[in-house]
């Protein structure tokens, strides 16, 4: 949203206590008047009136009332159960009850609260009951009758108690819906008057007071409003201006304990809780919520600078990782679970919202006894905690693509200040379920393609490994073939050398002192000697017909035979090794 002062909303001063308020304070019982005055005095000490933005100012004041009366410790489900225990669910909405019965209701609420808390955390029930009752009377009993309507009590307590805003709105709709499940416009007008009485009670009537204009800002008189449309209107961005403080009140409760380990550049506090604001123009310039709301600055920073609101803290490393992750995403996420930034008035329902009317409501038992049942029944429209994505403050735009929205907002606030009642209702409130289905289908297809690519990569990697093994086996085979060829050549050389020696033995002259042929012919021979052929036969014949000295020739022949034997043994070993390698590859599946 674009605001005229660049850094926040129009400065709308809170109203001081009016004369009517003082007359009402004097007309109520003294005890109630004193307790109400005590609340007002303590609220003034918090200096909420110095907050520049009316929305934040109203939310801060009501948050103070919540914490002071301890009603923020009671959730919506226990509050509804207290209504049932005291029989308020069986009474018509405009039934008037006495102050004593309202006090009995508050007694039930806070006594049940102490039963759920440990002893060290018990609240002072008397103080809480008296303060809350005084606030209710100050807000709704303007005529000093000492009575309150059932509807005003339900609206006030359901608004101020703890719990999710969507659950509270469902309960409120159950109170203002007809038997067909559609909103009754007369009851809605009454509801709006009751809830805006809370902001009027904390002196924010100039901005958030009830008027016919406020009713027209929400719905047209002839519009059929179902539960989904009702929720979508109050949880949309932006919601109707008269009720903008309501979602902010719940977001304040959710970030009240969020810790930011950074230094505020205005007040120099080393760390703080709540919201954190970062300037989009000044380098690493950050402010705590108190300084930003009240316009405190330092250095060259100006309130005209654009600011972003953060509800949690991320270290620079996490921010970098998150930015890289978002840049690599093919499809934008529809919801962010852990994001740290929020739109100041953004509340989204966790699922597509249908514009069809909800089924008729049973007003006698509209709210289930347990939260689990109602969450199951409304799973399509239940909302999670407030989103935490970084966005601009109301009136700020970080991108040039929303200029049209900025002009619309300027026109809206100009019309509001000039007193016109026209409020352009937002169109396209429900999400397109077909688009969601298409996105899911596309995601499934991409996941399937990714799985196929992973399987194909694994197959190619396995094939590459197999090819490498086959190439190594081929190289080994070539090496063995080369060795076999070399050994065969060596064998041929040795055989030629042996034949040459045999030829010398057969053709050489006989020594003078040698053995006679007759003596050699008389040497005994075995059967194996007679079977010698080839070289062995030549050797045998050489010994029988000795022509050279026997000792020399025998040594040469034995040496040649040893070399042939060694060469053949090496050849056999190499062949056996090659055969074992081939068998191993076959076993491994190559």
Swiss-Prot record:
Matching SUPFAM superfamilies: EF-hand (SSF47473), RING/U-box (SSF57850)
Binding site for Zn(2+) 2: 279, 282, 301, 305
Compositionally biased region (Gly residues): 1-10
First and last residues of each zinc finger (ZZ-type): 259-315
Sample GO molecular function, one term: acetylcholine transmembrane transporter activity
Traits of the deletion mutant: Mutants synergistically exhibit progressive myopathy. In dyb-1 and hlh-1 double mutants, there is an uncoordinated phenotype associated with some muscle degeneration. Overexpression of dyb-1 in dys-1 and hlh-1 double mutants delays, but does not prevent the onset and progression of myopathy.
Sequence segments annotated as region (Essential for interaction with dys-1): 484-490
GO cellular component: a single term: dystrophin-associated glycoprotein complex
Region (Disordered): 1-25
Coiled-coil blocks: 434-508
Residues annotated as binding Zn(2+) 1: 264, 267, 288, 291
Family according to the record: Belongs to the dystrophin family. Dystrobrevin subfamily.
Subunit structure: Component of the dystrophin glycoprotein complex (DGC). Interacts with dystrophin (dys-1) and syntrophin (stn-1) to form the DGC. Interacts (via C-terminus) with ctn-1 (via N-terminus); the interaction is required for localization of the dystrophin complex and ctn-1 near dense bodies in muscle cells.
Function comment: Plays a role in cholinergic transmission and as a functional partner of dystrophin (dys-1), necessary for muscle maintenance. Required for localization of ctn-1 near dense bodies in muscle cells.
Recorded domain comment: The coiled-coil domain mediates the specific interaction with dys-1 and ctn-1.
Protein name per the record: Dystrobrevin-1
Organism from which the protein derives: Caenorhabditis elegans
Taxon lineage: Eukaryota, Metazoa, Ecdysozoa, Nematoda, Chromadorea
Gene: dyb-1
């Amino acid at each position: 949203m674009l605001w005229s002062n660049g850094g926040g909303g129009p400065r709308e001063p809170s109203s001081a206590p009016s004369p009517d308020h003082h007359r009402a304070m004097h007309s109520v019982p003294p005890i109630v008047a004193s307790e109400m005055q005590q609340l007002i005095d303590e609220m003034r000490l918090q200096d909420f009136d110095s907050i520049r933005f009316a929305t934040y100012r109203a939310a801060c004041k009501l948050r103070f009332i919540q914490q002071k009366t301890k009603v923020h410790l009671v959730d919506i489900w226990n509050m509804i159960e207290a209504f049932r225990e005291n029989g308020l669910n069986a009474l018509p909405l405009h039934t008037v009850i006495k102050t004593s019965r309202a006090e009995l209701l508050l007694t039930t609420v806070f006594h049940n609260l102490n039963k759920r808390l440990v002893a060290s955390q018990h609240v002072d029930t008397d103080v809480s009951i008296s303060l809350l009752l005084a606030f209710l009377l100050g807000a709704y009993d303007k005529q000093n009758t000492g009575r309150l309507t059932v509807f005003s009590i339900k609206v006030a307590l359901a608004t101020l108690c703890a719990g999710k805003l969507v659950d509270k709105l469902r309960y409120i709709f159950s109170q203002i819906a007809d038997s067909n499940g559609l909103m009754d416009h007369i009851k809605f007008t009454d509801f709006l008057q009751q809830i805006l009485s809370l902001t009027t009670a904390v002196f924010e009537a100039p901005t958030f007071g009830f008027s016919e204009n406020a009713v027209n800002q929400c719905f047209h008189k002839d519009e059929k409003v179902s539960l989904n449309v009702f929720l979508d209107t109050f949880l949309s961005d932006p919601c109707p201006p008269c009720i903008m403080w309501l979602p902010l009140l719940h977001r304040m409760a959710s970030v009240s304990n969020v810790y930011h380990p950074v230094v505020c550049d205005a007040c120099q506090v080393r760390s703080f809780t709540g919201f954190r604001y970062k300037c989009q123009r000044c380098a690493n310039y950050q402010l705590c919520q108190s300084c930003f709301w009240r316009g405190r600055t330092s250095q060259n920073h100006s309130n005209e600078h654009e600011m972003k609101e953060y509800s949690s803290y991320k270290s620079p490393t996490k921010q970098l990782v998150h930015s890289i992750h978002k840049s690599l995403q093919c499809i934008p996420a529809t919801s962010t679970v852990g994001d740290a930034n929020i739109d100041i008035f953004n509340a989204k329902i966790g699922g597509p919202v249908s514009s069809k009317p909800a089924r008729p409501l049973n007003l006698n038992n509209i709210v289930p006894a347990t939260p689990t049942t109602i969450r199951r029944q409304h799973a399509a429209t239940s909302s999670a905690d407030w989103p935490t994505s970084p966005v601009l403050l109301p009136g700020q735009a970080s991108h040039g693509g929303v200029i049209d929205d900025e002009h619309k907002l300027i026109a809206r606030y100009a019309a509001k200040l000039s007193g016109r009642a026209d409020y352009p209702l937002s169109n396209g409130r429900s999400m397109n379920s077909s688009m969601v289905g298409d996105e899911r289908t596309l995601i499934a297809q991409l996941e399937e393609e990714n799985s196929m690519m992973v399987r194909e990569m694994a197959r190619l990697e396995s094939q590459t490994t197999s090819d490498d093994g086959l190439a190594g086996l081929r190289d080994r085979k070539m090496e063995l073939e080369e060795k076999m060829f070399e050994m065969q050549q060596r064998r041929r050389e040795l055989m030629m050398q042996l034949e040459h020696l045999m030829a010398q033995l057969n053709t050489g002259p006989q020594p003078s002192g040698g053995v006679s042929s007759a003596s050699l012919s008389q040497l005994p021979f075995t059967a194996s000697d007679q079977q010698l052929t080839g070289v062995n036969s030549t050797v045998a014949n050489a010994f029988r017909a000795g022509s050279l000295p026997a000792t020399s020739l025998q040594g040469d022949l034995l040496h040649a035979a040893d070399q042939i034997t060694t060469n053949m043994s090496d050849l056999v070993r190499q062949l056996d090794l090659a055969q074992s390698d081939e068998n191993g590859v076959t076993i491994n599946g190559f």
